[in-house]
Amino acid sequence: MSVTRILPAPKGIFLEGTAQVYRGDSANVFTATGRKDVSYVGHLRGYRDLSESTNVDLGFSYAFGHNDVGSAFHTQLYGLDATLRWKPLRRSIYHHFLARTELVWSHRDQLSAALLLPETQRAFGFYTSGEYRLNRRWTVGARYDRSDRARQANLTDSGFSALLTYWPSEFSQVRGQYRFARYAEKQDANELRFQFLFVLGAHGAHPF
């Protein structure tokens, strides 16, 4: 179940709140082992125009649910996110910039590996990324991420990505990405990814 509502706010600020309740599993984060095991998610979003070309989005999130250890063990997630957009109105198809970042704190109840006693594992992770449109056809971007593991916060993984996007037309997109990852076990990984998108039919609405 999900409810979204626009909240009262000072002039010039758009404020939106979302609350969700659901029962089910969400990968390794939440697990419903009992009939009454439900998870709760809340998000508060604020938007403001800084100028006719620049705007900012700020958000706070909270999630609570049962994890895979059992119904008596919970995981809590706290998140902060921010998005900055620069898009000049008269030249938006030639130049624009988009920056995003998100920080997440995890508090996970579990049994200690040594004594099998209840403990709370506290982990932190974040990512930050940016994309800049060079001209009508080319966009460059980069992303950095770093996160502790939820079950073992003393183990930290990190990674860096660089991407290049080419737009042959408004109906197609070609993207190449290189990613380097360094895992807590001192193992490195190098990945090359390629993506091709195309659209059939009428011209769709432009994204915000």
Question: Where in this protein do the model-derived segments appear?
Answer:
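Residues that define the transmembrane beta-barrel architecture of outer-membrane proteins
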Residues: 1, 36-40, 74-78, 120-126, ...
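Membrane-embedded beta-strand positions of outer-membrane beta-barrel proteins
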Residues: 3, 17-19, 44, 58-60, ...
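Transmembrane beta-strands of outer-membrane beta-barrel pores
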Residues: 5-7, 21-25, 48, 62-68, ...
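Solvent-exposed loop/turn segments connecting transmembrane beta-strands
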Residues: 29-35, 68-74, 150-157, 183-189
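Outer-membrane beta-barrel "beta-signal"
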Residues: 80-82, 166, 188-208
